[in-house]
Amino acid sequence: KRQGADSLREISDGLYSSLGKLSHLGATAVCRSTLSYANSKRPYKLYEDFYYVLLEKFRHEIQGRLGNKFTKPVFSLDSTTISLCLRLFEWAQHRRRKGGIKLHTLLNNDTSLPEVIVETTAKTSDIKGAKGILENIPPGSIVVMDRGYNDYSLFKRLTDKGVVFVTRLKDNAQHTPLRQGLIKADPDGCWGLYEMKFTGAKAKLHCSETNFRVVQWLDKETNRWFEFLTNSQELSATEVADLYKERWQIELFFKRIKQ
């Protein structure tokens, strides 16, 4: 059964109903207006510090769910929008009659806990938010992200940092294969892979010297083909497909925090 208070008035009423117990602590009840004033004046840094203390505590207490499934730490990168009342938060306007903030999140897939959350206005693009998270991604790890993060400068920065990424390839991405594709069938599905370079003008500014790999995967359950993009030359096609499935964990995380 859920316990707790839903409003400041409920908290205040609870304190006044426990005056006898409070007196033993040398404390008194606090009225609702005092609580409201304290909330409005209390700096956000207090809650930020408290959040990271709790995060560090649970990071060491929660047993990892991935075990030895992957040889490197796996993270998911994505964002979600939290709606706000535009009348109260005019600075958060992102549509004519709507307000909101965007949470750019790097999730640890082993613990299902966020490594870092960057808050911006909802107007901020996912790419810009992702670049603010880059310094928190450890070298030698794997980052899974959807194709909303198809950005050549982001690909280069991740590659230069020694971070492996797995994402969906955009349908209109200009590229040329470097090696003949390999097609194979296994119990989990049919797949093909080939090495490639991006050929678009914007891509040449950032990725002209980098070779990428495309994994084509047929999901037997849905009978759909998917094209995954990675900068790894070692991951197998099955591992790439399994890694992209891990991205679902961050969707579940967003669902939980919004409930």
Question: What is each PLM-predicted segment?
Answer:
Residues 16-25:
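Extended, structured, electrostatic nucleic-acid-contact surfaces
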Residues 24-44:
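Major-groove recognition helix of helix-turn-helix-like DNA-binding domains
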Residues 92-94:
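Extracellular beta-strand-rich solenoid/capping regions of secreted or surface-exposed proteins
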Residues 1-10, 14, 39-42, 49-53, ...:
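Single, function-defining residue in the core of a domain
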